[in-house]
Amino acid sequence: MTLSFLDQFASQSFLGIPLIAIAILIPWMLFPSPYKRWMSNRLITFQSWFIARTTNQLMLPLNTGAHKWAMILTALLLFLMTLNLLGLLPYTFTPTTQLSMNMALAVPLWLATVLIGMRNQPTHSLAHLLPEGTPTPLIPILIIIETISLFIRPLALGVRLTANLTAGHLLIQLISTATFVMLSIMPTIATLTFIVLALLTILEIAVAMIQAYVLVLLLSLYLQENV
């Protein structure tokens, strides 16, 4: 029976343990709930500090009216960051490498920012379609260009996250395959490629966290224009 390379990700169990149970337990272990004690442990303290720090950074450039989005943006950041980091584990599938999922997250949130602007301050929101000081003959062209750029925003959010994560996973796959193949033929070269693989994995951990932050940061900037 011939199996494709991607069939290894379709396994329903690993070492006799259902993968659905592991998939449910790992996020629960990463984000423990606080308990009623005078002093929290180090993990909960770090978790609370990280969430508070991230929320402050996201809400810093926004006015008071946009602070009600703090919970949504912070939850989205933690959700994307968790999926990106878990996707770096061997033999795991990364949902955020799928454009359909990223677009399903980006389009509704982008549309919500646009609708809020059109409802609360339509004149200010429509003013973004025409830069100040535009010559009269260029007004129709610039309005069309700005409208197209407005509708491209959610596509750019989804494609950016998908492309960066997919490229990193492909590089890790290629270098790890080369390391495994050359291990018995050229051990010295295999050692060098393994070092490159370790450095690339560290880089991909940083990319996984940065790309989640960039997507949420851009959403907060879009929100700033309409609130």
Curated annotation (Swiss-Prot):
Keywords: ATP synthesis, CF(0), Hydrogen ion transport, Ion transport, Membrane, Mitochondrion, Mitochondrion inner membrane, Transmembrane, Transmembrane helix, Transport. InterPro entries: ATP_synth_F0_asu (IPR000568), ATP_synth_F0_asu_AS (IPR023011), ATP_synth_F0_asu_bact/mt (IPR045083), F0_ATP_A_sf (IPR035908). It is found in: Mitochondrion inner membrane. It comes from the Eukaryota. One of its GO terms (biological process) is proton transmembrane transport. The keyword Transmembrane helix applies. It catalyses: H(+)(in) = H(+)(out). GO terms for molecular function: proton channel activity; proton-transporting ATP synthase activity, rotational mechanism. The chain crosses the membrane at residues 14-34, 69-89, 98-118, 139-159, 165-185, 189-209. PROSITE patterns: ATPASE_A. GO terms for cellular component: mitochondrial inner membrane; proton-transporting ATP synthase complex. CDD domains: ATP-synt_Fo_a_6. Its main location: mitochondrion. It is a multi-pass membrane protein. Subunit a, of the mitochondrial membrane ATP synthase complex (F(1)F(0) ATP synthase or Complex V) that produces ATP from ADP in the presence of a proton gradient across the membrane which is generated by electron transport complexes of the respiratory chain. ATP synthase complex consist of a soluble F(1) head domain - the catalytic core - and a membrane F(1) domain - the membrane proton channel. These two domains are linked by a central stalk rotating inside the F(1) region and a stationary peripheral stalk. Component of the ATP synthase complex composed at least of ATP5F1A/subunit alpha, ATP5F1B/subunit beta, ATP5MC1/subunit c (homooctomer), MT-ATP6/subunit a, MT-ATP8/subunit 8, ATP5ME/subunit e, ATP5MF/subunit f, ATP5MG/subunit g, ATP5MK/subunit k, ATP5MJ/subunit j, ATP5F1C/subunit gamma, ATP5F1D/subunit delta, ATP5F1E/subunit epsilon, ATP5PF/subunit F6, ATP5PB/subunit b, ATP5PD/subunit d, ATP5PO/subunit OSCP. Belongs to the ATPase A chain family. This is ATP synthase F(0) complex subunit a. The gene is mt-atp6.
